């Protein structure tokens, strides 16, 4: 299974990673790679919890993140 994640660096320099298609799957790290590893763990835990409670896995959402200039 592949999911898209969004990574942003906050004002304190911390990288925040989230999976928009899986509500609540958010993590952070001091580096981009650490944030990715941490959100992967959060996603795995989320999916395991769904499976444990016989909940359906949300369908993949075709998302696109576009950067625009203002």
Task: Spell out what each predicted region is.
Residues 1-4, 37-70:
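Short, charged, surface-exposed hinge/linker loops at domain edges
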Residues 23-32:
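A short, exposed loop/beta-hairpin motif centered on an aromatic-Gly-Thr core
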């Amino acid at each position: 299974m592949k999911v898209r994640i969004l990574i942003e660096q906050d004002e304190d320099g911390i990288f925040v990673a989230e999976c928009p298609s899986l509500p609540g799957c958010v993590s952070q790290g001091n580096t981009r790679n650490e944030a990715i590893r941490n959100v992967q763990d959060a996603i795995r835990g989320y999916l395991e919890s769904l499976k444990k409670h016989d909940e359906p896995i949300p369908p993949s959402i075709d998302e696109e993140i576009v950067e625009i200039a203002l």
